[in-house]
From Swiss-Prot:
GO biological process: translation
Cellular compartments per GO CC: cytosolic large ribosomal subunit
InterPro entries listed in its UniProt record: Ribosomal_bL35, Ribosomal_bL35-like, Ribosomal_bL35_CS, Ribosomal_bL35_sf
Keywords from the named record: Ribonucleoprotein, Ribosomal protein
Listed GO MF terms: structural constituent of ribosome
Source organism: Polynucleobacter asymbioticus (strain DSM 18221 / CIP 109841 / QLW-P1DMWA-1) (Polynucleobacter necessarius subsp. asymbioticus)
SUPFAM superfamilies: L35p-like (SSF143034)
Protein name per its UniProtKB record: Large ribosomal subunit protein bL35
A Pfam family recorded for this sequence: Ribosomal_L35p
Amino acid sequence: MPKMKSKSSAKKRFTVRAGGTIKRGQAFKRHILTKKTTKNKRHLRGSTEVAKADVKSIRSMLPYA
């Protein structure tokens, strides 16, 4: 059986942590930032965990992660 391919888009967006949780970056911080408050932009820094409902589909996109 041939190797399964990982989705390139998912490889760029998600990383699987040692505990099995999936890390993702925050959205809404690329442009149109003038109307957003400083507090709002500060909370969008860093990364967060993927929602439990989405984990199964992301794992299928990353078979070897």
